[in-house]
Amino acid sequence: MKLDFLINILLSDKPSKNIKFNEKQIFEMIPELSACKNFNQNNIWHIYDVYDHILHVVDGVPNSLALRMAALFHDIGKPFVYTEDENEIGHFYDHWNKSNEIFLNFISKYDLNEEIKNTISKLILYHDLNIEKLKEEDLLKLLNTFNKDEIIKLFQLKKSDLLAQNKKFHYLLDDYKKQQ
């Protein structure tokens, strides 16, 4: 299957609808995505399984290849790092690294502009970063890692990610608005 097929879906008006319509082909291209379907996250932050959460995030970001591709892969590693604590609460430690590994493995089969590939990778790796708790030196490192456009994309991804979670935590958007 060609990358253009996936790109056309991601850049459509309602990517989630087109992903679901072409689910068999998408799962053949990205088998790890099928592991996300019906994978319950078992924590108060999430109201959707991993797959539906991903689809909500993809729909929620602006129409940009880097953003939509990052949204598609941002939590794809969760089923592979899932643990539960003694209270049966689900945790996904280091899922951003696993998600990025899956993305890099996937994209290595295709010819995609290096700059876009690097932006997607950075967005996946940093999407779960708790920006408001960063120390000054960490914030400076972040600013050296991302250009201005990428910082904007990171906040757009984080916003869509938060909006696709439990509404009890949407108040955290106020923090993002202050930081932008």
Which ranges hold each PLM region?
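Divalent metal-dependent catalytic cores for phosphoryl transfer on phosphate-bearing substrates
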Residues: 59-168
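Charged substrate- and nucleic-acid-binding regions of tRNA-handling and nucleotidyl-transfer enzymes
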Residues: 1, 6, 104-109, 162-180
